[in-house]
Swiss-Prot record:
Top-level division of the source organism's lineage: Bacteria
GO-annotated biological processes: arginine biosynthetic process via ornithine; L-arginine biosynthetic process
EC top class named in words: transferase
Protein name per the record: Acetylglutamate kinase
Pfam families per UniProt: AA_kinase (PF00696)
GO molecular function per UniProt: acetylglutamate kinase activity; ATP binding
Catalytic activity as recorded in UniProt: N-acetyl-L-glutamate + ATP = N-acetyl-L-glutamyl 5-phosphate + ADP
InterPro entries with a match to the protein in the record: AceGlu_kinase-like_sf, AcgluKinase_fam, ArgB, Asp/Glu/Uridylate_kinase, Glu/AcGlu_kinase, NAGK-C
Stored NCBIfam families: argB
Residues engaged in binding substrate: 65-66, 87, 186
Lineage: Bacteria, Bacillati, Actinomycetota, Actinomycetes, Mycobacteriales
Length: 290
């Protein structure tokens, strides 16, 4: 059922408190999942970023590219594997990831946003020393496990991103970054988004997923929560499914780093970012400091 004109006006008026609270603030959005594979959702996400920008909010997009990387690896006949929720990255896999993230996924999103005007600029963690990486391991069945050329973010230099924001642009960040010796790593986009949100002093970190939010007792659909504090979330972490772990670790990192709230939202919902930021119902789970 379509809204009447007064109803549409009321929707806009109802959003005013949130628009006021976020005016001039930075919101880091991790773009991934179905939202980056479905054409309708991709277009809606791009429109959401432009909406935020034109309302005086500063969106910064950090994107993944898991499905696209997997598809390219398959096309090239290169084996792929995951451990602890992270992609095992050999030198061959890294070259594919580098090509796909910046040359395909990032370019597509930049073009979708720029259909509305000269807003988006794509950069990588390699540009202007944005990210300095350090090699990481992951815990698999309680054992620290090497996963190849996969890095964590050791340092963030926000100068380039802040320059883009000051120029009225929307940074679109691909998460490939070198260490201090110049060896390049693939950084999980969830991890990178949290580190960037912390370094920028962002007001919010939004994580797009393919679920309705956080379930405290999956697969019990009744265990979906709309808000949880960081202590309760940390206790829940060992029970979560492997694919959700990097996202929840990222939320906790952001909260511990001073970001007021992190949000795990359903990227399958059209305009999910606007729904989460500007409605009472939201589109997922809000994480706050204990």
């Amino acid at each position: 059922m379509s809204l009447t004109t007064p109803d549409k006006a009321q929707v806009l008026a109802d959003a005013l408190p949130w628009l006021t609270a976020l005016n001039g603030k930075i919101v880091v959005v991790k773009y991934g999942g179905n939202a980056m594979t479905d054409d309708r959702l991709k277009a809606a996400f791009a429109a959401d970023m432009v909406f935020l920008r034109n309302c005086g909010i500063h969106p910064v997009v950090v994107h993944g590219g898991g499905p696209q990387i997997s598809a390219m690896l398959k096309k090239l006949g290169i084996a792929g594997d995951f451990k602890g929720g992270f992609r095992v990255t050999t030198p061959e896999v890294l070259e594919v990831a580098r090509m796909v993230l910046f040359g395909q996924v990032g370019r597509e999103l930049v073009n979708l946003i720029n259909a509305y005007g000269p807003y988006a600029v794509g950069i990588t963690g390699e540009d202007a020393h944005l990210f300095t990486a350090v090699r990481r391991t992951v815990m698999v069945d309680g054992v620290a496990t090497d996963i190849g050329l996969v890095g964590d973010v050791e340092r963030v230099n926000t100068d380039a991103v802040l320059d883009l924001i000051d120029a009225g642009r929307i940074p679109v960040v691909s998460t490939i970054a070198p260490d201090t010796a110049g060896l390049v790593y693939n950084i999980n986009a969830d991890t990178a988004a949290a580190a960037l949100a912390e370094a920028l002093g962002a007001e919010k970190l939004l994580m797009l997923t393919d679920v309705e939010g956080l379930y405290t007792d999956w697969p019990d659909r009744g265990s979906l929560v709309n808000q949880i504090n960081s202590d309760a979330l940390a206790e829940l972490l060992p029970t979560l499914e492997e694919g959700m772990v990097p996202k929840i670790e990222a939320c906790l990192r952001a909260i511990d780093g001073g970001v007021p709230s992190a949000h795990v939202i359903d990227g399958r919902v059209e305009h999910c970012v606007l729904v989460e930021l500007f409605t009472n119902e939201g589109a997922g789970t809000k994480v706050v400091r204990s």
